[in-house]
A protein has these predicted regions:
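Signature of Gram-negative outer-membrane beta-barrel scaffolds
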Residues: 1-69, 95-96
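Short loop/turn motifs that connect adjacent beta-strands in outer-membrane beta-barrel proteins
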Residues: 15-17, 71, 129, 186-195, ...
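Transmembrane beta-strands of outer-membrane beta-barrel proteins
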Residues: 20-24, 74-76, 132-134, 177, ...
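Transmembrane beta-strands of outer-membrane beta-barrel pores
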Residues: 26-32, 78-84, 91-93, 138-142, ...
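Outer-membrane beta-barrel translocator domains and adjoining extracellular loop/strand segments
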Residues: 32-41, 87-93, 100-101, 145-151, ...
């Protein structure tokens, strides 16, 4: 894959409180690829023919910042972005597993995913360290890519129990709200200035349009695969001198991870709740030494997939708490 690009950019300041940045980026993508067909029964590979492709994209962007005053900022933007298919998805390869009667093939006809993005946010900065912000975003996504999984599917005269191929599955609209807050607690009492909190929350609503998935073309009401509806992060920290202690929490709701021939076969990545704690102490001037310790996954959150509904577990893996400690020396 060879990418050639160029851009123009224009910056302008209106009065003293409004800043504009506009630009246009052009990218030319050229592809040359070959693949290999693998058969596990014979343990042999055969090389496929060489294929080529190319496309050009023009990606505009406009960003505006309004400094309402020293503490309050409003930002708005429109951007167009590009996400190229993974190499492994593009390569015209065929992988046959005779034991399980499964086949995986690449798709050299995949188009890049284009996203049209609108963002609006407002930030307020406290007199002391910290800020509170709120934002709205909207994305129109064309030609998103998913792995299409079909069962009992015939390919080149042979029926396979499971057939997998990446494909452009349609378009999607996505909008959401995001909030963040960061501040130390010195405004409550001076003794608490070393203690602080940081948190974010994002709500995302997505709907798929023009669903191009064999056997499910007329389906509606689907969420965009890989897009959780709720995500949140929170961190409570203590920082004084060389001592740093932080307790962190992360949450993401469940989402579709893999599309099946019907909703019954859709694979979901289950909701996760992670909690970690880490601490470090740094001392020294010419030679700095840092003792650190951390413990991850305090809640023993499993890696879990389910099929269709939450009560149909496909896979669950528990890793327990992971701990690490050590010493760093820098000079």
């Amino acid at each position: 894959e060879t990418v050639s690009s160029g851009y123009v950019r224009f910056d302008h300041k209106f009065a003293s409180d409004i800043n504009l940045m506009a630009g246009l980026r052009m990218e030319h993508t050229s592809l040359r690829y070959t693949g290999r067909n693998y058969d596990d029964e014979t343990d042999k590979t055969t090389k496929t023919g060489r294929m080529t492709n190319s496309y050009v994209n023009f990606l505009p962007s406009i960003l505006v910042k309004w400094d309402v005053n020293d503490d309050f900022k409003i930002r708005g933007s429109y951007t167009q972005t590009l996400s190229r298919p993974k190499y492994s998805a593009l390569v015209p390869s065929v992988n046959i597993n005779r034991g399980d009667n499964e086949i995986k093939i690449g798709n050299s006809d995949l188009k890049p995913t284009i996203s049209y993005n609108f963002d609006l946010s407002a930030d307020y900065y406290f007199k002391s360290v910290g800020l509170v912000s709120a934002g709205f975003f909207y994305k129109k996504i064309d030609d998103f890519i998913v792995d299409q999984v079909l069962t009992n599917y015939e390919y080149q005269g042979t029926e396979y129990t499971r057939f997998t191929q990446p494909k452009n599955a349609g378009n999607a609209n996505l909008w959401g709200l995001e909030f963040s807050y960061q501040r130390d607690f010195g405004f409550i009492a001076p003794a608490l200035k070393y203690v602080g909190f940081y948190g974010t929350y994002t709500y995302t609503h997505s709907r798929v349009e023009d669903f191009n998935f064999e056997g499910r073309e007329n389906e509606s009401g689907l969420s965009l695969p890989g897009s959780p509806e709720h995500t949140a992060n929170a961190s409570l920290y203590f920082e004084k001198g060389g001592l740093n202690v932080r307790l962190s929490y992360n949450f993401a709701s469940d989402f579709i991870d893999e599309m099946g021939p019907s909703t019954f076969y859709d694979r979901y990545y289950d909701a996760v709740n992670y909690m970690d704690v880490n601490a470090s102490y740094t001392f020294g001037k010419k030679v700095k030494m840092t003792f650190y310790a951390e413990a991850n996954n305090l809640l023993n959150q499993p890696l879990r997939y389910y099929q269709g509904t939450k009560d149909r577990t496909m896979q669950a893996e528990y890793y327990g708490v992971r701990m690490n400690a050590g010493l760093k020396i820098s000079f």
